[in-house]
């Protein structure tokens, strides 16, 4: 628990990842692992040799830095939860479970496994910058790519913004293991695993629930037990099926992602990301009508975030007009 709180206490966002990058590098040094940092700020480390699983995460969050930032604990019948606290203003702030949980999972895998690689991506929250620009040759010995960058406790993501992440062969061997932890297939939105698959990295990828909730908001919380569960699942997947390559290339299809055409170009939760042209288009903000994450006030037609739109329309059962009427009634 001490290590987890130490990690969560570090503040990092796309404008300033230096503290988190330094922390990760120090942890790798303590494990005696060699690592490299590429031109885009991605941290890459290999342990072992030959074909091996890759575990990936991103080192930025969406949250502004808080001068008097603390991590607090609260325990209830569901488990132990971490949350961020601004002690100066006496109010809750985002803890950054998205994706500090993934960082923890990567470090855990490196500690537990003898043959594994890890990549800590830069600036995922402003368009998957790290995974979009990393040299794919880094993954030449990958058997599969696992990421823990999903809300909740039970999602085994098979589509990321319309990109299929793995095929039937991987599904046949991986899902029985995931089922032991209560994980079921689900569709998700953009993250590094999806970006790599869209770039034809060549192996099966999957994104897993990491036990955080209310991501990208001041109400974000992290369930410790659910994070420990996904860490154990990742280790079991790596040990059971990580020794042989699970080749996969997605079929060409429309990709509603950050930098591609979508209902609107970017998720509207990019707040004041370092893209001044985008910032100029988002002069004010308002909570999403459904999940209350922050969206641009000038979002087309109605104020919902891309996640809610995709969950209900792109991958859901509502038509655009039906969903528009629903949001107007909320």
Regions inferred by a protein language model and the residue ranges of each:
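Zn-dependent metallopeptidase/amidohydrolase metal-coordination segment
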Residues: 53, 184-230
């Amino acid at each position: 628990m001490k290590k987890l709180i130490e990690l969560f206490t570090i503040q990092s966002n796309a404008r300033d990842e230096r503290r988190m990058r330094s922390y990760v590098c120090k942890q790798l040094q303590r494990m005696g692992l060699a690592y490299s940092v590429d031109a885009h700020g991605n941290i890459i480390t290999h342990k072992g040799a030959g074909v091996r699983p890759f575990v990936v995460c991103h080192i930025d969050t969406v949250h502004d830095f808080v001068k008097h930032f603390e991590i607090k604990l609260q325990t209830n019948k569901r488990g132990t939860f971490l949350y961020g606290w601004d002690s100066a203003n006496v109010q809750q702030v985002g803890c950054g479970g998205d994706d500090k949980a993934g960082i923890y999972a990567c470090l855990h895998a490196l500690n537990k496994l003898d043959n594994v690689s890890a990549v800590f991506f830069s600036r995922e929250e402003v368009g998957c910058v790290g995974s979009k620009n990393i040299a794919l040759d880094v993954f030449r010995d990958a058997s599969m790519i696992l990421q823990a960058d999903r809300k909740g406790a039970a999602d085994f993501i098979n589509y990321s913004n319309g990109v299929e992440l793995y095929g039937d062969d991987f599904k046949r061997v991986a899902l029985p293991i995931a089922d032991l932890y209560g994980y079921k297939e689900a569709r998700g939105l953009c993250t590094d695993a999806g970006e790599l698959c869209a770039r034809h990295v060549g192996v099966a990828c999957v994104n897993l629930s990491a036990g955080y909730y209310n991501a990208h908001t001041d109400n974000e919380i992290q369930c410790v037990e659910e994070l420990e569960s996904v860490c154990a699942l990742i280790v079991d997947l790596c040990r059971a099926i990580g020794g042989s390559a699970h080749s996969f290339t997605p079929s060409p299809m429309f990709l509603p992602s950050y930098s591609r055409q979508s209902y609107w170009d970017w998720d509207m939760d990019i707040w004041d990301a370092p893209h001044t042209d985008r910032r100029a288009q988002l002069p004010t903000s308002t909570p999403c009508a459904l999940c209350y994450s922050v969206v641009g006030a000038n979002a087309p037609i109605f104020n919902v975030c891309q996640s809610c739109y995709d969950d209900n329309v792109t991958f859901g059962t509502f038509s655009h007009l039906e969903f528009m009427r629903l949001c107007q009634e909320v």
